[in-house]
């Protein structure tokens, strides 16, 4: 993570302005500028575990990962630099949380790509920190204001839920498929066999819908769920609890925190990281699966039909099969045999 994003490049045009500032970086932190910008002091708060991994290596305890920031996370900061995500409710959750903790008078900078909808920040913060656009470059906007009034923040008000075949799915801003079951997951679910047994790992679990739906018709499976997103981890825990399903849920960058082997790994892997297209997570998932599958175990994933996963599956497992497809999606299946590279 050495190349800077367009948003960071815009901030670097103003680097002299930040040398005396005690800065909290937050939002969609796609690079390590928070660790490298010359400031009086720097902290970072992120809801993304993989971003925290990169930043914590350079910033130590000054980089924090959690769903909700606390007073300790913003201590002594006089400036907020917020990277706008592509998801407006996610931005609202994070900004209301952070502005409720920062003292009145804090300098507020919001930066983001124009296509992400960053201009909405002016409207969102109008009652708390009126913003003005201070720069426009690299197809990004940079906005500045000063905190005049702290909002009241209640994380519980951001919870949502929807029903799928009698199951209740709990969601939070920033969780994939927040408003209903996506078509890809639906296709993957249609391929799962009732009365399955064994240890199942759900990678990139989102709100936990794949796991609870699987557990309903295969109650003897033992579930482990992981995701890079703090909102997803909390949403999955809530979804499991609401539906009376047991399982372990934790934050992990694909397999980074996963221990042991499983009889089945299921996933609807992401191919976007913020505004950027990224196949890294899915390729890491496929290549790393052989280190976490028992002999005869199975990797089953759903993906957009145009994505180049068949080659990686064949290279890793020796073969693959397509067990369901629509015009847009394919469900791939690969079995752990002697042909598979053992990683």
Swiss-Prot record:
Gene3D superfamilies reported for this sequence: Vaccinia Virus protein VP39
CDD domains: AdoMet_MTases
Chief location of this protein within or outside the cell: cytoplasm
UniProt-recorded Gene Ontology molecular function terms: 16S rRNA (guanine(1207)-N(2))-methyltransferase activity; nucleic acid binding
Top EC class for this record: transferase
Pfam families: MTS (PF05175), MTS_N (PF08468)
Subunit structure, interactors included: Monomer.
Protein family per UniProt: Belongs to the methyltransferase superfamily. RsmC family.
Function: Specifically methylates the guanine in position 1207 of 16S rRNA in the 30S particle.
Listed name of the protein: Ribosomal RNA small subunit methyltransferase C
GN (gene name): rsmC
